[in-house]
Amino acid sequence: MKNTNWFKDAIIYQIYPRSFKDSDNDGMGDIKGIIEKLDYLKELGINCVWLSPVYESPMDDNGYDISDYKKIYSTFGTMEDFDLMLSEMHKRGIRLIMDLVANHTSDEHYWFKESKKSKDNPYRDYYIWKDKPNNWTGFFGEKAWEYDETTDSYYLHLFGKKQPDVNWENELVRKEYKDIIKFWLDKGVDGFRCDVINLISKDQRYKNGLNPLILVGKKYYINGPRLHEYLNEINRDVLSNYDCMTVGETVFSTLDDIKLLTKEDRNELSMVFNFDHTSVDNYLGVKWLMRKFSLKRFKKTLDKYQYGLKDEGWNSLFYENHDQRRSVGRFNTDDDKYRVESAKLLATTMYFLKGTPFIYQGQEIGMTNMQVNSLDDFIDIETINVRKTMNKLPLTKKYIDKSIKNGSRDNSRVPMHWDDSEYAGFSNSKPWLKVNENKSFINVKQSQNDPSSILNYYKKLIKVYKEYGDIVRDGIYKDLLPNDKKLFTYERRLGDKILLVVSNFSNSNIKCDILDNYKEFNKEVLLNNYDNESNELKPYQSILYYLSK
């Protein structure tokens, strides 16, 4: 089947199922809850959903620890519920991509239960076992090896100890994942978001790492020697037979890495999630090590990939997901007075770059980070482990508290605010994670009734995006003021047609005469988060112009 590259025209909405909508009032979101809200998504204007894991799981890491790839977690529903959801999405012109977690499974998966029984078990080499561990550490701040007394051996886990890494060197493992991918594509699923996909190949020497601080040994397990071979094999043997897309989560990858992963004729991934732009307010790409946001640094990072992938590869455009904190209050937009304006500014600035937009649930109404009274309110496994690690370091309590509050994955996992009722319309029972008090004024129902709301701005933005899709998809990008510390101004040019974005990332009025450079063009304002339009931009004002001859 010919791949139509439909992902280049997609507007993708991420659903984190346990926090989206609870249909049976058990405090946990579910598939029937998603079905209830499909008309809302259709009205928003998106045309694809990325669904975080709904597979069978003990939920040690909220579904990223899978015990059966071909079953649905019972709290989320049944396979019949899933099939109905997929059918109802397709009826509304909405495609579905699923999370594919292929670097690790749950330790409760049948493969691992067998693997740990004995050294000569047929499933032994499905995982990575060593008689002695090296010094690698993983992404949750722990040692990356866990001792198992049954066979007096250690298994590798780059995430939680209940998430053992699978051994992609084993051809049987690769066959298993091809079969899993085919199973879901045959159901009609439209593609996959591939979780930490650039970790699947490890350097087989298993050398000790040199970095004494974080992710010890990462040079030996990130972008490993056979990564491209494995991805090409999966594409050749399975994906190429379907009109589907893949987006890879590729941590700590460079521009050159991403070119290799996404260049069309290499047949590996459609695009990747690159996190450089979400790391401009931290050190070393580690969200817990905070530093002040710099717009100049932010632009430089985005420019690198806009220019670097213009002729080869493809960009993903995002601020938020289930691992990132909320964008409102971040990226120099932490002035509560301008919460609405800054949310609109962020949307306009990001989504007219070249690439595929990803919107995370609640982002379209300006949901904020989790409101906590104590660090004990955070229940995420990563947060708990990192907090333990930070408490052992020579850091002040104030710094640790701020880091945990800003960095916790729970920030984006607060249940969706549908209305201002006790549990925000998410459920009639106490949710698995508490809702925010600001549900009283940040919720879908109120947003739908307010013409100037963030939600209605997103709807308008998506309509504009579709109407000017040729420029958005193919227009040449140029950053017009790369060294300006407060303004982000860029153009997308396609022949004599230009989309011009002018954004003020500050809480003060700023004069901007950029339009003087386009006097020979006819001017039309397509989007504006204020009622006025002049060469003096108001705080957090963002304007999208259409210029034509």
Predicted feature residues:
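Acidic/aromatic-lined carbohydrate-recognition and catalytic surfaces
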Residues: K2-K182, D186, L199-T254, E264, ...
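Hydrophobic residues within beta-strands of alpha/beta enzymes
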Residues: V49, F192-C194
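C-terminal beta-strand-rich structural cap/linker in extracellular carbohydrate-active enzymes
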Residues: E533-K549
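Beta-strand-rich binding/interaction modules
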Residues: N509-N528
